[in-house]
Amino acid sequence: MREILHIQGGQCGNQIGSKFWEVVCDEHGIDPTGRYVGTSDLQLERVNVYYNEASCGRFVPRAVLMDLEPGTMDSVRTGPYGQIFRPDNFVFGQSGAGNNWAKGHYTEGAELIDSVLDVVRKEAENCDCLQGFQVCHSLGGGTGSGMGTLLISKIREEYPDRMMLTFSVFPSPKVSDTVVEPYNATLSVHQLVENADECMVLDNEALYDICFRTLKLTTPSFGDLNHLISATMSGVTCCLRFPGQLNSDLRKLAVNLIPFPRLHFFMVGFAPLTSRGSQQYRALTVPELTQQMWDAKNMMCAADPRHGRYLTASAMFRGKMSTKEVDEQMINVQNKNSSYFVEWIPNNVKSSVCDIPPRGLSMASTFIGNSTSIQEMFRRVSEQFTAMFRRKAFLHWYTGEGMDEMEFTEAESNMNDLVSEYQQYQDATADEEGDYEDEEEQVPEDE
């Protein structure tokens, strides 16, 4: 019941995805061959959210893995949990997208997309009541961004009423992998605004900062970064997979977090994050978790929530704790930092509590916030985009694949509209909304 279909695309998506499956398998007590080796019945109660049970009692992830080159797939297949996936669900091309959005979206990706959709359809038919899709990808490359957004729009056509949740890794401000990242990211955001329901915005630089500052790792690897992401990913869906006092699912999350349909880009955070050495000196309490999860240093994308205001936020706690205490802490946060919340959305912090904590912790929490400060990310990408686009730099890579300059202009203006929408709601006050209502009320009296 309430299954989620997981899709990972491109190198980044596949690496995050494989880490995520390690975490989920661990939580449900499933070993790398797909056998159940857990100890608690709760692990099996709703294991079917992410797993199909095969005839021989093995659990097979509901995962579709796609890429335009075989390299990353091979490393997933040889990785610790490589044998657990259904072999038919690996869909890959040979040519690669070469960090080119147009190749992923229009040429190479378009040739492969039908075979990916067949696998998705097959998995969806195996579900009892499909809740939605979660997609892992990056927006800077070619496959995750170009083909990822193509797949999202195709799935949107075929399953219009299912939730579409994405974990999107944005290009970092200071660390750039390729020069055309701003192009790829802008073209992708253009698609995500229209076709996704909820986007969790991640960014390598912010994740590096968390590893350096909070976890005190001297040389963080991508594995460490992906581990942070997968902790958050499993936190978002823990309410579906384990019993809890206040449940939430993807749709409830959307209802509570998205006041206006286009503004669905969220910041995420996770607590407790402590360095290995200092772990034993910290008490895990609800106030302690709350304080860390609202901390700006804890956000997994390079935007500072103190520069904007929260439209809405959601806190998902895991572990044995009293709901009363959780509610008190949430009200406390809102009262103390009231200037950081818009006053025209009442009760804009939603909390949920799930009884089963992650492995090795007594309690943990996942934070998802819809903050207007996320516009910093879009602004930054947009500036880099404009700097290149007005000189038409590197455009021939895209026009050569059959794209039109018009598409770039459209994507650019869509992103700028998004930024100004966030700005508009950041500046909006309750009085303005009030005046508007008064005018409406006066109309009948004049008649």
Swiss-Prot record:
Cofactor(s) in the UniProt record: Mg(2+)
Location(s), subcellular: Cytoplasm, Cytoskeleton
Molecular function in Gene Ontology: GTP binding; GTPase activity; metal ion binding; structural constituent of cytoskeleton
Composition bias, Acidic residues: 429-447
This protein's UniProt keywords: Cytoplasm, Cytoskeleton, GTP-binding, Magnesium, Metal-binding, Microtubule, Nucleotide-binding
GO CC terms: cytoplasm; microtubule
Binding site for GTP: 11, 69, 138, 142-144, 204, 226
GO biological-process terms attached to the record: microtubule cytoskeleton organization; mitotic cell cycle
Superkingdom to which the source organism belongs: Eukaryota
UniProt keyword Repeat, yes or no: no
Induction: Down-regulated by abscisic acid (ABA).
Biased composition annotated in UniProt, kind: Polar residues: 411-427
Binding-site positions, Mg(2+): 69
Region (Disordered): 411-447
InterPro entries: Beta-tubulin_BS, Beta_tubulin, Tub_FtsZ_C, Tubulin, Tubulin/FtsZ-like_C, Tubulin/FtsZ_2-layer-sand-dom, Tubulin/FtsZ_GTPase_sf, Tubulin_C
Tissue expression: Expressed in leaf sheaths.
Main location: cytoplasm
Subunit structure: Dimer of alpha and beta chains. A typical microtubule is a hollow water-filled tube with an outer diameter of 25 nm and an inner diameter of 15 nM. Alpha-beta heterodimers associate head-to-tail to form protofilaments running lengthwise along the microtubule wall with the beta-tubulin subunit facing the microtubule plus end conferring a structural polarity. Microtubules usually have 13 protofilaments but different protofilament numbers can be found in some organisms and specialized cells.
Record family assignment: Belongs to the tubulin family.
Role according to the record: Tubulin is the major constituent of microtubules, a cylinder consisting of laterally associated linear protofilaments composed of alpha- and beta-tubulin heterodimers. Microtubules grow by the addition of GTP-tubulin dimers to the microtubule end, where a stabilizing cap forms. Below the cap, tubulin dimers are in GDP-bound state, owing to GTPase activity of alpha-tubulin.
Protein name per its UniProtKB record: Tubulin beta-1 chain
Gene that specifies this protein: TUBB1
